[in-house]
Amino acid sequence: MTFQSKKFPSTANTNTFAAKYRAMMKKHPFLLFGLPFMSVIVAGSFILTPAAAIRYEKYDRKVRQVSREEELGLGQRKRRVDIREEYYRLAAKDLDNWEQKRVERLKGESDGLL
């Protein structure tokens, strides 16, 4: 004795939209699934292209090309750095004379004291 692999369709389920769609899907799978899927992909591409263009235009406005005159003027305000001078300046600081101060806590926050 063997059991059938096909389930017996009840009459309540055969009249629904989903049952009719499943039956039509077996006959025309590309028309009812493939074509709508591909059209959504193509339409999404056309819709998202301007969004990507806006993103790159915003980036281009932020990063602009610097002219030669502006480029030459940018480096004039910099301080010349000598490694020996920086070493002596940092060595002259009094790093041993300091006092620890507690940061004021927010209301309701634990202060960490035991």
Swiss-Prot record:
Name of one Pfam family that matches: COX16
Subcellular location as annotated: Mitochondrion inner membrane
Keyword list, A-Z: Membrane, Mitochondrion, Mitochondrion inner membrane, Transit peptide, Transmembrane, Transmembrane helix
Domain of life: Eukaryota
Transmembrane segments: 29-49
Membrane topology per record: Single-pass membrane protein
Main location group: mitochondrion
Record function comment: Required for the assembly of the mitochondrial respiratory chain complex IV (CIV), also known as cytochrome c oxidase. May participate in merging the COX1 and COX2 assembly lines.
The protein, known as: Cytochrome c oxidase assembly protein cox16, mitochondrial
